[in-house]
């Protein structure tokens, strides 16, 4: 057995030895403390936001950020205003950044925008899910198109931001006041260029920059970020799962959201040299060409222009030295070897004069586009070619910054240029120089307008998610009326039917004048009343409640019925007005045209006009002309009914008037009776209720020579607005509306419609129209309209929308369920009717028709829903 004392001695010696050894744990902690882990948020200068001043307090700078409403187009006056801002308002030597962001996060906007075009009934949830999936899938990928048509048509939302910061370490009160004044000056200058702005606060800032930095290619919904007032802004802009890897030719960005990993590839391209020519109004064609839609950038991107206005004295001195050197060389043998030296000397001489007089300034600028796509080589190659080709079409040569993608990516973020990044760009030789007017033409400020927050989803030609709501009050429209013209197959009916459905779903009513059964299917599917013109029965006095308000309208109706060609004069109309009032006062709603004729007969035989042969002659003429509408007259059965065909409880009424076309006198009488009925119903219903009257084939229904018809239409179209009423008039050709050949009624409808939609036109007729009226359309508009295709061939309708002075180009895509609902094809109509007879509801019948006509598409939408819908509620 060992000695216990030896064991104790050994233990003590071990402890002493251990105490003499160096402290390895302390050394490890020291090494860990010295290690610097790479963290992207540390590169960002964002720190705090001053609520009182609206300024951002960064690490070494102080600045502001504005969101601007993109302008739909531009002209020379806007460019001159921007040039003036650069020359006279912007501090020298400090970067200003303009960011145009094409966002894929449109999920919320789609859902909100479709709320008035949603399905109702027992199948509403299932139907709305399919319709929503149709547009969501288009935003994630692109709209389905026929084989061979490879156009990048998707859904995006464009936003413009302007950021500026200047060095300020102490953030003194003087610096803050100076920056506040600069914000006011910049905003006023932009307003002078028709660019409306609003300031970006801290919450909006972390949402915007968070979207710029944390791109998830699988997400369609913006992430809800909660502002933490106790944390620096730079940490709140970067996701915890953010994983950025730098490659030679691109960056990869990894994120983890809702239990799923995503990886995006970030590509950058910057301007290689000054373009030979550039116009502000054409800048949007760089990312989406109107005439060549295949030259479009469909992936999300950020187009950034970073500019610095150089010191005027230094640039003027530089121009002087350059001019004197070149002017001297141009007078020596040097010019024989380099003939261009004379031209250069002249250009520098002109530049120094402009700089000396303050007419121009020299601006250094860097134009870069940052694109986001899925992380695979095939997709990245397509994106690269789309970007390079789109810009090259307009004379912009872009290059990829090999080994410098991180640098270029940082330039698309606010306030980064002011931290010293622009200096690095200059040292790298990628900054261009140009005069202020030329740089103003490069500003990424032009993009399409989303129009209204909700309505008919009709994306623009540049893929901007847009909605059309004719009852929206923010479009500077003076009324809610719409004029539509397009040849057969252009998609007129498919465009109007969703508008009708939205009015009905909102609780309003719609009346359609049709010639050709185009709305019969929709009427049946919506539970409306379908009436043939031959069965219509009227009474001009049936719906009158106030004779003082309605007497003149009834008089006008009877005047046109008596003389469709407008041969009655003021005396005729005065006598007729007396007859109308007397008939109403005697029998009220039971009055008939017979009572009007009886009054005229009694007046003709009375002693009052015994000595007035001219008046008696007029009375006799009206008696003869109105006799055909009395109870025993040719058309008496149409206008003397005790029970008129039209009842106020019908939400939708379609009137097929094709059978009356060969009887123009009867047709005009019926038209007037219908319009008066609709007017009276508008007046008698609450003003918050939407009312719609669609006049299809207006070129046939409004082709009357009587000027009274035009006045009648004009008055009705003008007064409808006060009662939330709208008239939609549809013709085959713009000549039917806006030409010397158009009837007064058609011209009145065109002139009193704030909304004008022009679809595909007959090529021959449209060319002839442009020769006769060369100022009606701009050359670009003629070329665009000339390229419109047939709706069935390209699976969408193309149209020009004009709202007062605003013009925009749109496409209308319709989901398979809506296509089935609106289809007027004979076999489709019979299919639905047969299913209804079998006991199916209208929605079940439409569902089966959609699967019958578009089975693969319906299957793909259901599969998409199954994969993505579970993440929708989380988002």
Curated annotation (Swiss-Prot):
This protein's GO cellular component annotations are: plasma membrane
Which CDD domains did the record assign? TrwB_TraG_TraD_VirD4
Q: List localization entries.
A: Cell inner membrane
- Keyword Repeat assigned to the entry: answer is no
Q: Which InterPro entries match?
A: F-pilin_assembly_TraC, P-loop_NTPase, P-loop_TraG, TraC-F-type, TraC/Conjuga_ATPase, TRAC_dom
Q: Name one Pfam family in it.
A: DUF5934
Matching NCBIfam families: PRK13721.1 (NF010278), TraC-F-type (TIGR02746)
Name used for this protein in its record: Protein TraC
- Lineage start: Bacteria, Pseudomonadati, Pseudomonadota, Gammaproteobacteria, Enterobacterales
Question: Corresponding gene?
Answer: traC
């Amino acid at each position: 057995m060992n000695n216990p004392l030896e064991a104790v001695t050994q233990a003590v010696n071990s402890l002493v030895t251990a105490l003499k050894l160096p402290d390895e744990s302390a050394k490890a902690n020291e090494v860990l403390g010295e290690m610097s882990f790479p963290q992207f948020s540390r590169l960002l200068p964002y720190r705090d936001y001053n609520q009182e001043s609206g300024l951002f307090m960064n690490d070494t700078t102080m600045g502001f950020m504005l969101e601007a409403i993109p302008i739909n187009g531009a002209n020379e006056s806007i460019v001159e205003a921007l040039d003036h801002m650069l020359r006279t308002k912007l501090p020298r030597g400090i970067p200003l950044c303009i960011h145009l962001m094409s966002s894929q996060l449109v999920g919320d906007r789609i859902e909100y925008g479709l709320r008035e075009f949603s399905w109702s009934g027992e199948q509403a949830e299932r139907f709305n899910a399919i319709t929503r999936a149709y547009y969501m899938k288009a935003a994630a990928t692109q709209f389905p198109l026929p084989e061979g048509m490879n156009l990048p048509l998707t859904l995006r939302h464009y936003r413009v931001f302007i950021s500026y910061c200047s060095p300020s370490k102490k953030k003194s009160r003087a610096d803050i006041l100076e920056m506040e004044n600069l914000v006011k000056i910049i905003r006023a200058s932009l307003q002078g260029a028709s660019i409306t702005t609003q300031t970006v606060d801290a919450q909006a800032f972390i949402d915007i920059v968070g979207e710029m930095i944390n791109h998830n290619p699988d997400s369609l919904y913006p992430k809800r970020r909660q502002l933490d007032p106790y944390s620096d802004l730079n940490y709140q802009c970067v996701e915890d799962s953010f994983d950025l890897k730098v490659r030679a030719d691109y960056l990869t960005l990894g994120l983890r959201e809702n239990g799923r990993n995503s990886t995006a590839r970030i590509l950058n391209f910057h301007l290689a040299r000054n373009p030979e020519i550039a116009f502000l109004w054409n800048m949007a064609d760089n990312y989406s060409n109107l005439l060549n839609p295949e030259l479009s950038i469909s992936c999300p991107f950020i187009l950034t222009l970073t500019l610095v206005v150089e010191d005027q004295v230094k640039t003027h001195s530089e121009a002087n030295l350059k001019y004197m050197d070149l002017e001297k060389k141009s007078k020596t043998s040097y010019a024989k070897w380099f003939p261009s030296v004379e031209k250069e000397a002249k250009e520098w001489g002109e530049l120094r004069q402009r700089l000396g007089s303050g007419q121009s300034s020299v601006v250094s600028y860097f134009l870069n586009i940052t694109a986001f796509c899925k992380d695979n080589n095939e997709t990245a190659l397509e994106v690269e070619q789309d970007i390079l080709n789109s810009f090259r079409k307009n004379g912009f040569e872009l290059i990829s910054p090999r080994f410098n993608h991180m640098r270029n990516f940082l330039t698309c973020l606010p306030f980064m240029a002011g931290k010293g990044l622009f200096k690095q760009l200059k040292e790298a030789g990628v900054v261009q120089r140009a005069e202020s007017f030329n740089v103003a033409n490069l500003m990424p400020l032009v993009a399409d307008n989303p129009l209204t927050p909700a309505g008919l989803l009709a994306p623009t030609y540049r893929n901007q998610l847009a909605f059309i709501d004719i009852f929206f009050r923010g479009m500077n429209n003076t009324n809610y009326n719409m004029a539509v013209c397009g040849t057969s197959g252009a998609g007129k009916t498919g465009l109007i039917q969703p508008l009708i459905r939205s009015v009905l779903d909102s609780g309003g009513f719609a009346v359609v004048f049709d010639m050709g059964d185009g709305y019969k299917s929709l009427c049946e599917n919506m539970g409306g009343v379908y009436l043939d013109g031959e069965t219509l029965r009227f009474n001009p006095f049936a719906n009158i409640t106030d004779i003082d308000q309605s007497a003149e309208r009834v008089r006008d109706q009877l005047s046109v019925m008596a003389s469709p060609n407008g041969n009655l004069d003021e005396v005729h109309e005065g006598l007729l007005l007396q007859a109308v009032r007397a008939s109403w006062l005697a029998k009220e709603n039971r009055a008939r045209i017979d009572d009007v004729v009886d009054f005229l007969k009694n007046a003709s035989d009375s002693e009052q006009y015994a000595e007035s042969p001219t008046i008696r002659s007029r009375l006799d003429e009206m008696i003869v002309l109105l006799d055909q509408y009395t109870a025993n007259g040719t058309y008496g059965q149409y206008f003397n009914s005790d029970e008129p065909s039209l009842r106020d409880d019908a939400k939708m009424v379609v009137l097929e008037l094709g059978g009356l076309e060969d009887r123009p006198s009867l047709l005009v009488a019926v038209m007037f009776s219908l319009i008066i009925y609709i007017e009276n119903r508008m007046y008698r219903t609450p003003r918050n209720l939407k009312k719609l009257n669609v006049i299809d084939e207006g070129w046939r229904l409004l082709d009357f020579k009587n000027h009274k018809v035009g006045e009648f239409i004009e008055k009705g179209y003008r007064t409808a607005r006060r009662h939330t009423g709208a008239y939609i008039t549809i013709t085959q050709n713009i000549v039917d509306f806006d030409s010397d050949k158009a009837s007064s009624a058609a011209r009145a409808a065109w002139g009193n419609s704030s909304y004008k939609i022009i679809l595909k036109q007959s090529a021959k007729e449209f060319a002839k129209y442009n020769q006769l009226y060369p100022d009606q359309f701009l050359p670009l508009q003629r070329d665009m309209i000339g390229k419109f295709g047939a709706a069935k061939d390209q699976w969408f309708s193309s149209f020009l929308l004009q709202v007062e002075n605003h013009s925009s180009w749109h496409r209308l895509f319709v989901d398979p369920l809506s296509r089935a609902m609106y289809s007027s094809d004979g076999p489709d109509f019979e299919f639905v009717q047969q299913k209804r007879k079998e006991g199916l509801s209208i929605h079940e019948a439409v569902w089966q028709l959609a699967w019958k006509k578009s089975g693969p598409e319906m299957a793909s939408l259901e599969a998409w829903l199954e994969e993505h819908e579970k993440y929708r509620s989380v988002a």
